[in-house]
Amino acid sequence: MDHEALRIWSKRAADWAADYHASLRDRPVRAPLDPGAVARKLPPSPPETAEPMERIWADFQAIVPDGMTHWQHPRFFAYFPANAAPASMLAEQLVNAMACNALIWQTSPAATEIEQVMVDWLRQALGLPEGFVGTIHDSATNATLSAVLTMRERALGWRGLDEGLSGAPALRFYASAETHSSVDKAIRVAGIGQRNLVKVPTDATRAMTGAALAAAIAADRAAGLVPAGVILCAGGTSVGAFDRIADCVAVAQAEGLPTHVDAAWAGSAMICPEFRPLWAGVEGADSIVFNPHKWLGAQFDCSVQFLKDPGAQVRTLGLRPTYLETAGREEIVNFNEWTVPLGRRFRALKLWFVLRAYGLDGLRQRIRDHVRWAVAARDRLAALPGVEIVTEPRLSLFSFALETDAATEALLQRINDDGRVYLTQSRVDGRFVIRVQVGSFDCREEDVMLLSKTVQEMLASCSSGPLPSR
């Protein structure tokens, strides 16, 4: 395949993409397949000779779309969204064509400088004060890992980088049980050890309070342990919990501890000023992460980390061997020194396209619609016999259940097998619940209202096949 063939096939691919998105409502959201079904359709060995693109394209159409769970489906209410707005898809086509590695300024000046400006545009959009700068990671997992590594080095007086962790004191980090599992992964990868991640008890709203955090830190200091950092939750993955950020930041500052706020999902909603009280006090944090690829339409992967003191993270992660130096350019930013990977994609272009193509007003309206529709869906589900709302909507996320875990699990299975909507599960105080999050970029009100209709039909069908009891 040469570049002239690329011209032809790119047009076909663009047509296919538009048709695919237009057809999503007619497809089941989740692939109705058993494990191994796709692999069995592929030959066991690679071809020795080139195959015509017509054959490759035909195989793609025959195998791939029906083997996918459709994350862009308007009725994808599972997990959190991974939205791809049309403007984002267009930008990614251009990025793929240029195929750059934006590891340092010299390798891609436009990628570096657009990233700097886009991060600042987002800072302004979220209402964060001047003084925060930042970078774009692939995921919140790597952003949190970067923050944890920096906290570790601060606590060790920057000795861990040279001397390793052998003989170093056990460092203690603090978070609530509502924080994402990526926090646990960061703690493990950073060599802190799972048992040194203190899960601070939460209040009735599932929030870590300043008082609870202060008590946990005091207990560790009394035991001769070394507190190193605090990780706060702003919109937990399970049911949308928010820690008392202002109170916890104040405690951390009084204790001399840095703070990192995980707002991977909910951070996007903060472009709407009315939602900002949920993360009040965030301006006092040292590090904040949110994912535009979840709710702003800048497709995966695109995770923005804001930093008050990038120098500390650069000191932790940055290396500048001779072969990566840019002569006479000491004032430039090399973003590979801010992140764990050396190689970097040109992720900022899709932000530039999305923010301009929809504007903050357009993006705000989508988020406000999603929140409003989630509340309406909650009310309709609450009116169904046997359905209990377990957690009330936090932004566009809530949960519900039936009387027993077994009945709830069976209902979830029926809903997802039906295919019109897709939901996933969590546990609240040990109870199995069904999560509902509204956030698809192309979702309409009627898509959300179909949720309660589907649940009602699945409950009614139980008369011919009862849901099991615990």
Named regions from a protein language model:
Residues E130-G131, A168, V390-S396, R427-V433:
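Short Gly/Ser/Thr- and Asp/Glu-enriched loop/turn motifs at secondary-structure junctions
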Residues S139, A143-V314:
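Conserved PLP-enzyme active-site core in the AAT-like
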Residues V428-R470:
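PLP-dependent enzyme catalytic core of the Aspartate aminotransferase-like
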